[in-house]
Every structure is written in structure tokens, then in C-alpha cells.
UniProtKB/Swiss-Prot annotation:
GO MF entries: ATP binding; hydrolase activity
InterPro entries, A to Z: Actin, Actin_CS, ATPase_NBD
EC number per UniProt: 3.6.4.-
GO cellular component: cytoplasm; cytoskeleton
Name of the protein in question: Actin, cytoskeletal 4
Protein localization: Cytoplasm; Cytoplasm, Cytoskeleton
Length: 154
């Protein structure tokens, strides 16, 4: 996690890793053992864009984002493209905002302005948002008991 990053161009990065050791980094494990990582640094987070690397038949994060926007009313799509906010721990990888910008731009209409927002506090944004929502008095009417949950499920 500390050494990983998202490649802007995965294939180009693979070629660079194959022809040079410039992408290699050493890391000391808690037991003192030192390991060297190469293309693993960007291959691991690439599964966010290519879940097939993990044997999953699902869309990448960029396609899921695009599909979500396209399912919204046509009148708000422009605003969604211009205000896509990254949140959660998986968005902490360096390079993820630039890659999302590139991928969404390639999927969206050519004249569309794309802006990916990666706030510094995004690692905890999901928790903070849930905390704010849970503290609203209007949200309390949506609460259910454990017994209700056990009976009806999610």
C-alpha cells in the first residue's frame, strides 16, 4: 500500500518496468526483511480499472462511474462530470485522479468538461459522510432495530 500507485498508462508502465529497474523500490518488513517490488507497485491497483486481473467479471471503477452518470437525468450529467469526487481508502493511491480523468474523458462526450476532485481527507470521507448523515434528526426516522433487520434483511 505504501509503495503502490496508479499508472496513467498501464501498458507503457509495464514496458518501462520490463526494460529498466527505475520503478523498483525496496521496503523493510516489520521483521527486518527487505523486499524489492517492481511492477507489482502499479499492477495491484490496476485491478480497480481491470477487475479481470483478479478473475472478476465486472466493470472497472471508471466504467462504473461513467455508467452511473449515464443513468442520471440528462440535465445533471454535465454537473456530475464536472464534480466527480473520489472518496475512500482505495482512492489514496498516487496517480488515481489523473487516471480517472483520462479514463472518464475517453468515455464521455468529447465536449464534456471532466473534473475529478481528490480531497486530501478522502480516506475518511465515507466515514465522515455516514457520521453526518447518522447525526441528522431527519435520518432517525429511517433507523431500524436489529430485530427488524434480522426479520427483513438489508
Amino acid at each position: 500500500e505504501k509503495l503502490c500507485y496508479v499508472a496513467l498508462d498501464f501498458e507503457q508502465e509495464m514496458q518501462t518496468a520490463a526494460s529498466s529497474s527505475s520503478l523498483e523500490k525496496s521496503y523493510e518488513l516489520p521483521d527486518g526483511q527487505v523486499i524489492t517490488t517492481g511492477n507489482e507497485r502499479f499492477r495491484a491497483p490496476e485491478s480497480l480499472y481491470q477487475p479481470s486481473f483478479l478473475g472478476m467479471e465486472s466493470s472497472g471503477i471508471h466504467e462504473t462511474t461513467y455508467n452511473s452518470i449515464m443513468m442520471c437525468d440528462v440535465d445533471i450529467r454535465k454537473d456530475l462530470y464536472a464534480n466527480t469526487v473520489l472518496s475512500g481508502g482505495s482512492t489514496i493511491f498516487p496517480g488515481i485522479a489523473d487516471r480517472m480523468q483520462k479514463e472518464i474523458t475517453s468515455l464521455a462526450p468529447p465536449t464534456m468538461k471532466i473534473k475529478i476532485i481528490a480531497p486530501p481527507e478522502r480516506k475518511y470521507s465515507v466515514w465522515i459522510g455516514g457520521s453526518i448523515l447518522a447525526s441528522l434528526s431527519t435520518f432517525q426516522q429511517m433507523w431500524i432495530s436489529k430485530q427488524e433487520y434480522d426479520e427483513s434483511g438489508p
